[in-house]
Structures are given as C-alpha cells and as structure tokens.
C-alpha cells in the first residue's frame, strides 16, 4: 500500500507543473525554456518549410493525415530493407511484407500491436529510425490533436498542426525522454549499439544476450503511452525494467502527460471565463478538477475490481 501511495503522490506533485507548462506551450505563452528551444524550432521550421498561421479544422486534419501517411511510407521501406542498412551488427534481414505493414500502421496509430520479437526481428537502425521515431511522432500527433481540440472547446483558433507537432517534440517529449532514459540507464537498462553478447551459462551451454538502445526506446514508449518494447517480452524482461525504481519511473512516465493534458484543458477553459478580479491562476481550473476527480474515482474503482479478480 505504501508503494501505491508513494507513486500516486509523486504523480500528483509532477502532473500540475507539467500541465501548466503544457498550457503555456498550447497557448503560445512564454516559458522558462524558450531561450533554448526557440532557435531549435525556428531552424526546424526553416528546413521543413513550415509557415506560421492558424489552420481551419479541415487543414489541420489534412495536415495530420498527410504527415503521418508520409512517415508510414518511409518507415515501411526501412523495415523492408533493414538487412542492407547500417547499425545491424546481428545480421537481421528485412521484415516480411504483411508484418512490415502491420508494424508500421500499428506504431504510427499509437496502437503498438507487436507481432515480432524486437531482439531478433529488427536491426538497431530499424528500432531507432522506425519504432522509436514513430513512438515520438505518433505521440506528438495525438497531443497536437488534443491541443487543437482543447483550443476549439475553449473558443480559440485551432493553431497550426506542424508547429504544434514540432513544439511538442522539442519542448516536451525529447527533454523528458532524455531524463527518463538516463534514469533507466542508472538502474541497469542497456543503451548501446554493440551486438549481442554470447556467454557461457552455469550449465555449460552458450546463450546469446540481446543488447541495444533499450533505454532510448523505453523512455519514449512510456512517456508517449506507446506499447510494445525492444524485446519480445516487453517490460517483463530485466533489461527493460530491471528494478523497483525503474518500475516506478515507467509507471509515472505513462501517467504524466495524459494527466497533464487534463490540467492544461482546465486552465484553458478557466482563461475563457475568468473574471478580471482573478489574480492567481488555479491549479487546474474547475473543469479540470472535475475531470481529474472523475478519472481518479474510476481509477480507484477499477483497481478494486482488479484486486478482487486477482484474489479470486
């Protein structure tokens, strides 16, 4: 019980400042990180030819679908020809047609249905350039759509999909994934480009131990509420989730951004109806508190039901 209370307390402590930070990003207000990320964003806009300006809902939706379609095509091709690409120390061949299609669609839609064992089915290049890349972009696409939806409900213009996607990746997902990745490495999660290691067991037989850029994938997998994993058994393997602390880190990572979106939504609605006398911004706004409370009640009810199922 103490462990559960500790994780939930840490979640509440982290989710409010994270939600306020995302609120400032969603409403294009100044943040403490602007000095670092503004030049990065401008460089990306210049390279990609992204122009500012608000979009209609049709333009926003079309941009989302088109961008994701292009990434699906590129990712599919990489999976098919991974055997000829770099960063393939274990000599893994190209993925079969239908499995490539299933994999790329699954990870682009944030469904993350995985019908392959990552340690034997994907090269490091495919893991990084397809799976990890899609975990970033699918999550960013979802959060961009969420931001646009919240803006619409609060009476604002929808914004620009490409600008939203870039800002979410550079200002939210990448920094958090870097921090979480370092924390997982400190707990024993591998992060290497070396090939598999062959060791002799205590029984006198030999076994291949799969390695790779595991921490990089695990960090964004949980932050972006993705599924799957670097290994076929996902986070039940010691390398993906080696300690109790890594388990807490991964649970908090999964909960952080979805909870922060509720805080962001509440603050955006509060802005639309606040009185001029209001000086101090609330923690999450009245609507945000209602939604957050409803989610907490459902969480407790479902947890009780799940506990009863396990005991029976």
Language model: regions and residue ranges:
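Membrane-proximal intracellular helices of multi-pass ion channels
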Residues: 1-312
């Amino acid at each position: 019980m103490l462990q559960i209370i500790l994780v939930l307390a840490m979640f509440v402590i982290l989710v409010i400042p994270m939600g306020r930070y995302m609120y400032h990003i969603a409403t294009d207000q100044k943040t403490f990180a602007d000095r670092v990320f503004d030049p990065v964003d401008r460089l990306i806009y210049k390279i990609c030819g992204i122009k500012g300006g608000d979009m209609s809902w049709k333009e926003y939706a079309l941009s989302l679908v088109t961008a994701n379609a292009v990434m699906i095509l590129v990712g599919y091709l990489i999976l098919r020809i991974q055997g000829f690409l770099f960063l393939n120390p274990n000599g893994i061949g190209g993925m079969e047609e239908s499995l490539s299609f299933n994999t790329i669609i699954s990870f682009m839609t944030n469904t993350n249905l995985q019908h392959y064992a990552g340690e034997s089915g994907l090269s490091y290049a495919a893991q990084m350039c397809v799976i990890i890349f899609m975990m970033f972009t699918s999550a960013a696409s979802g959060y961009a759509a969420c931001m646009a939806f919240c803006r619409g409900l609060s009476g604002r213009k929808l914004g620009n999909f490409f600008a939203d996607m870039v800002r979410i990746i550079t200002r939210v997902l990448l920094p958090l994934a870097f921090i979480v990745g370092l924390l997982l490495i400190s707990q024993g999660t591998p992060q290497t480009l070396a090939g598999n290691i062959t060791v002799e067991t205590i029984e006198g037989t030999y076994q291949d131990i799969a390695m790779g850029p595991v921490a990089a994938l695990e960090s964004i997998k949980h932050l972006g509420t993705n599924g799957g994993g670097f290994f076929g058994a996902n986070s039940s393997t010691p390398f993906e989730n080696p300690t109790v602390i890594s388990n807490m880190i991964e649970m908090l990572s999964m909960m952080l951004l979805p909870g922060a979106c509720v805080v962001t939504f509440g603050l955006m609605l509060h802005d639309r109806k606040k009185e001029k006398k209001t000086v101090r911004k609330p923690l999450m706004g009245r609507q945000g508190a209602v939604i957050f409370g409803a989610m907490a009640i459902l969480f407790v009810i479902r947890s009780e039901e799940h506990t009863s199922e396990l005991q029976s």
